[in-house]
Amino acid sequence: MLDINAIQQILPHRYPFLLVDRILEMEEGKRVVGIKNVTANEPFFPGHFPGYPVMPGVLVIEAMAQVGAVAILSMPAYAGRIALFAGIDKARFRRQVVPGDTLRIEVEVLKLRGTIGKSMARAYVGEELAAEAELMFAIGQK
């Protein structure tokens, strides 16, 4: 549905911090499904951990937030703005994410009032849940 070029028109993030490769499904302001292809070339793997590369959990959370931001920032009312973390609740990591994995990230917007919102995000590798969290966000000006 959205390739990397379209994603870069919506999100301000760039390499090495753009953690969304493709959007597969989207209902603006409601629900979104995106992909992060995890490769051996990720800049964090040499240090996390040498000889045993694991994607840091905080970056899995960040990838979930970026996918969710696409659904919000695609709305005409929020176009050209930026989504910022306002909180993270109930974060759980269920499996390690390693080079070669494809993260399928599903985000459902639970609440959006003005410039403050809450979403439920889940990241899967195949059919296995890798991580989940409730993400609170604020929409700001760039």
From Swiss-Prot:
Gene3D superfamilies for the chain: Hotdog Thioesterase (3.10.129.10)
Keywords: Cytoplasm, Lipid A biosynthesis, Lipid biosynthesis, Lipid metabolism, Lyase
Chain segments annotated as transmembrane: none
Keyword Oxidoreductase: no
GO biological process: fatty acid biosynthetic process; lipid A biosynthetic process
Superkingdom of origin: Bacteria
GO molecular function terms noted in the UniProt entry: (3R)-hydroxyacyl-[acyl-carrier-protein] dehydratase activity
Catalytic activity, as annotated: a (3R)-hydroxyacyl-[ACP] = a (2E)-enoyl-[ACP] + H2O
Entry GO terms, CC: cytoplasm; membrane
Top-tier EC class: lyase
Function comment: Involved in unsaturated fatty acids biosynthesis. Catalyzes the dehydration of short chain beta-hydroxyacyl-ACPs and long chain saturated and unsaturated beta-hydroxyacyl-ACPs.
Family to which the UniProt record says this protein belongs: Belongs to the thioester dehydratase family. FabZ subfamily.
Name under which the protein is recorded: 3-hydroxyacyl-[acyl-carrier-protein] dehydratase FabZ
Species per Swiss-Prot/TrEMBL record: Desulforamulus reducens (strain ATCC BAA-1160 / DSM 100696 / MI-1)
Lineage: Bacteria, Bacillati, Bacillota, Clostridia, Eubacteriales
Gene: fabZ
